[in-house]
Amino acid sequence: MGRRVEVTISIDDLHPEKGWGCEGDESVEYLQKPNDEFGCKFTLFVPSFYHKKYPLSEHKEWVDFWLDKDWVELASHGYYHMCEDSDRFGECEFFEINSVDKAEKTVELCLEEWDKVGHKPVGWRNPGWLINPLIKDSVDDKFDYVALHTEHNRGLNWSSKMLFGHDGINETDSINIWNDNTFMFQSHIAGDWNDNCWTKENYLNFRNVIEYLLSEYDISFKTLKEL
């Protein structure tokens, strides 16, 4: 048996829209399979009012569908996951916000949606990875950990536990050990502009990666909050 390591798998942008993490979706099947076969666990980063169309407060059954799975953690991924000036900021919601008051109000609204469905997320990932440094503290004191990108974090120091790592489920030859002893896989549930979605091709690739890691290491699968 090889070195003892941990493996985490995070997935961004799930919300209660068909094709984006709903019961019966093909992508959801590709999450269930590695849990059944290997015991994989997943941290799902969820915007609480995606694109102003899918408030969690109106979709409690969707939240409960995921919370009923003991191998899933639901974490926060912003409020709207969209910007007023999308040409300039894309969907980097908290990079566009440039005032503390607006940031605090947005975080408050974000967490209210979660509260209405009876769940308090302990983890956070910035939509689009980026955040305006001026408003970092508005987010920082609300969560136990933040999931970060080494480049896009741009040297910011958070008081919350900082978890780095973003290797894609579609990758095979550029996988790293992060945070001393953890393989940190990052992906998206859908979106044809992303190359790390849970398609059949990526699922099969990732299954091969997990089989290889299991042959080389003593693996413990974890959600991010379990690190």
Which residue ranges define each predicted feature?
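Active-site beta->alpha N-cap acidic-glycine motif
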Residues: 1-71, 218
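C-terminal domain-boundary segment and adjacent tail
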Residues: 2, 36-39, 145-150, 189-227
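Active-site flanking residues adjacent to catalytic metal/cofactor-binding acidic residues
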Residues: 11-12, 76, 148, 185-187
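A short acidic (Asp/Glu
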Residues: 19-21, 54-57, 133-138, 195-197
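Well-ordered, non-membrane alpha-helical segments in soluble/globular domains
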Residues: 22-31, 56-61, 100-108, 199-212
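Metal-dependent polysaccharide deacetylase catalytic core of the NodB/CE4 family, i.e.
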Residues: 40-132, 187-193
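His/Asp/Glu-enriched short active-site or ligand-binding loop at hydrolase and phosphoryl-transfer sites
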Residues: 137-173, 221
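A conserved mid-domain beta-alpha-beta active-site/ligand-binding segment of alpha/beta enzyme cores
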Residues: 156-181, 186-197, 202
